[in-house]
């Protein structure tokens, strides 16, 4: 068995079930946050502006507008053990794979809903 096959087998065992989502979708990511000896789950909701990588190293970027109208982006590894679950809140219809133009737009941008 070659090293490449071994890596693929290990990657396959690490993968967990995640819902299918694309850039433009609004998702709610439940993240496990460890504070001292306690652990709690924090929800982070926003628009997926990019998905990159493949396999176990796949990541996605979620952007949301926090209090005061400041945009906050967070990059999540898709198969990280700190992610409890991912919910798709609404499906957006966009024509780009990377929605970096949303960084320059002030206020809330309306993304058309996908049926």
UniProtKB/Swiss-Prot annotation:
Function in brief: This protein is located at the 30S-50S ribosomal subunit interface and may play a role in the structure and function of the aminoacyl-tRNA binding site.
Q: Which organism is it from?
A: Fervidobacterium nodosum (strain ATCC 35602 / DSM 5306 / Rt17-B1)
A single GO cellular-component term from the record reads: cytosolic large ribosomal subunit
Annotated GO molecular function terms are: structural constituent of ribosome
**Protein name, entry field:** Large ribosomal subunit protein bL19
Q: Which domain of life is it from?
A: Bacteria
PANTHER family for this protein: LARGE RIBOSOMAL SUBUNIT PROTEIN BL19M, RIBOSOMAL PROTEIN L19
Keywords assigned by UniProt, alphabetized = Ribonucleoprotein, Ribosomal protein
Q: Where does the record place a coiled coil?
A: none
Pfam families the record matches: Ribosomal_L19 (PF01245)
Can you cite a GO biological process for this protein? Answer: translation
Which family is this sequence assigned to?
Belongs to the bacterial ribosomal protein bL19 family.
